Every structure is written in structure tokens, then in C-alpha cells.
Amino acid sequence: MVFPSEQEQIEKFEKDHVAQHYFEVLRTLISKKSVFAQQVGLKEVANYLGEIFKRVGAEVEIDESYTAPFVMAHFKSSRPDAKTLIFYNHYDTVPADGDQVWTEDPFALSVRNGFMYGRGVDDDKGHITARLSALRKYMQHHDDLPVNISFIMEGAEESASTDLDKYLEKHADKLRGADLLVWEQGTKNALEQLEISGGNKGIVTFDAKVKSADVDIHSSYGGVVESAPWYLLQALQSLRAADGRILVEGLYEEVQEPNEREMALLETYGQRNPEEVSRIYGLELPLLQEERMAFLKRFFFDPALNIEGIQSGYQGQGVKTILPAEASAKLEVRLVPGLEPHDVLEKIRKQLDKNGFDKVELYYTLGEMSYRSDMSAPAILNVIELAKKFYPQGVSVLPTTAGTGPMHTVFDALEVPMVAFGLGNANSRDHGGDENVRIADYYTHIELVEELIRSYE
């Protein structure tokens, strides 16, 4: 099989009127900030998407009864026996904060050296426009769709999809029984293989706070008075071993271990080797797992306790000789099947008390359960076979990713097979500065989604 080169894909993209039209839609989408955490632009972008889908004949429902509006767009086939294909996406993004390094304005889509750059170009606005491009390209040459197609677009995915369960419960009758749900996004790995996965880790996030005194104290008392930051650091250290294993009683007993097929998929996985991760991220510290299979199992199938940030004391110019009275940390546990967010936090509370750190106060912020698809479902196997036609380096199949999303919520509501694949690359820098996708990958995703629609003929 002969595959087009990257330059040939770029040229096809530039000559494709449908793709170019929705590229301009993407430019507009990226220019419209839509950040749930800051409550910025959510209704504006939801309404803009509604208009875009209405223009091409979709039945559009915008539900503004939630903090972030939901947008649902239906394209119906006239076939009485038509199956249903669902695309789940989100239009919210993380902020483009001042501590991120951007070469150009993150909210002005830019193109350089075969790449598109902008906040949301991969996560997840670019996936919306690419998938709509694929649908429109199919409809250009056909009077009817071979499959019903529904788009579900939410605006709170980056904040744990706060209302998705309620929304799906209200609309489940319109969506339950679908043949397949294509998840929000996906990526090619460093070997240029398309990653196809069917699950994700869950998460529980929480704040840990310590108050050691009414006021900051002169540091001359450091040998006799405990300070908030030292107390908090010792408490956190007691929860994790040097190799990264979580030291919380009863946690691992509830973990659902991967089955033989899932471990077999891990054996054939070509990406996330320890050396590759060190190279991509320029790691300066030793890895917690050096042996390949132990590294991969920990990455995909084990929970992880992470510190997102720590704050305490003086951070200004020069010195300030104090014992800070307060310290806080933002923490998370990445969850796997068998672990429930509130239960995990309760176990951590009990462990801190047992370890002698009862003065640490914990505050739950958000949580999501984990999920793993059955990758042998016929609709998922169809995607895997179709993808092989478009990616010269092949595909890499995994039952889960190490990231987090509301797959569990969606499956509970709709009971539909779910698969994730997309247009990102191994260095798309989602959530960081210079978020990007290759133009060639963007166009290949359009072609694959169009082929997926065609496969229902």
C-alpha cells in the first residue's frame, strides 16, 4: 500500500474546499476564549457551534440550564435500519496562563512549518472541526447518510465534566443503543503510530492545608517550633514511597488488575518506553520505573499520587527570616478501575491520621471514575482495521490511556462501545505553551473519519 507523504497531505488539505472552510471555523473558535475555570466565553462558543451545525442541516439543541451549555447536533439517515455513530467533544480549554511560553498569541490560530498552533487546536476544538469536515465531505457526494450521526459537545471537560452525568441522564433515550461513540481526541505516538484506545484513568483532586500558628514566627524559633511547611512536607512524604508506590492502606487491594488480553496489548505497545519519555521531556531526575514492562504497567494500570503545586511562606526578592504559619498543596490521585474518588480520599485521611498528621486538613475538589472498553467489540475492531489504511507506521492499540476524562460517566448513561483516536502528535503540548497539531495529521483524521462514515454503507 502506498501512503501519501506529509507534504502531499498538506497540499490535499490546501486544495480541499470543505477542509479550508472549517479551518476558518477553527480559526474563529480558537479566537473565542472558552475556559470553564474562569467562566469565560462558554455561552458564546456554544451558540457559535450551534449556528455552525445548523447551517449544514443538523437538528441542534443547546441546553443552557447548566453552568456550561451543552450542544447536541443530530444528522439523521433516512434508512429505517440505520445505526447511530456518536462523536463526543468539548469546546472548553485550559487557560493560556502567563507562565506558559507561546511563540505567538495562543488565541490567534497560526501556521508555521506544517503545524497549526493555538489554544484548543488539539484539545479539543480542532477535533470538532475535523470531524465536521469529514461529515460534510461525505455529504458532498451523497444524498443521504448511511448512519445517524450525533455530536455531543460540552463546556466543562477540563473541570471534570461537572454536569455531564445529569445531562446524559436527561437525554439518554436519544443516544442509548448507538453502535459506537468516538471519544474527544487522540494522538500519534513518537513512532508515528496512531494510538487507538478505549479507556482512561479516573482522578480525585484535593487541597491539603496546614495552619501551625496564628502568625508567622521569627525563624530563630526554628529549632523548637514546628512550621506549617515542614509539617505538610513530612505528611506528604509519608504517603508515597521513593519508587512512587502509594503508601495508603487498603488502596491497592481494591485495584482491578489488567487481564491477560490487556497485558498482551501492553506487550506490543511501541511508545512510552522509559528512554523515549526521558528524551521527549528532557528529564533531569531519575525515572521511578526503569524496566520497560514495569514502567508501562505503572503508567497505564496503576494509581499515582501527584503533587500539582505547593505554596507557603515568602517568595519575594531577597530573604525573610520566618517560620510560615500556613502551607497548602494541591494534590491528585490518578485512579484505575476499582477505585472511587471519595473512598480514596477517605483512605488518605485515615492514613494521615495513623501517621500522626491529623493537623493536615483535606478538601475535596473534584473526582471522576476510570473506565476501560472491551477492545474486541466489532465497532472498535472496524475502526482499527480502517485506520491501518491511513497510517504507514501502523496503529498501536491500548485498552486505556493514562489521562482522565468522563468515559465512565458516558458508559454508565449510554452503554455504548467507546474508542479514542485523533489528530494529535507525540509533542502536541496539550495544556502547555505552543499547543499544536500537524496539518497532515489533521487532514488524515478527516479522511479516516470520512472512511468510518462510509463503512456503514
Residue ranges and their predicted role:
Residues 91-92, 239, 243, 349-358:
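A common structural junction motif
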Residues 195-211, 421:
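Flexible glycine/proline-rich, aromatic-decorated loop/lid segments
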Residues 166, 222-244:
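A short core secondary-structure module
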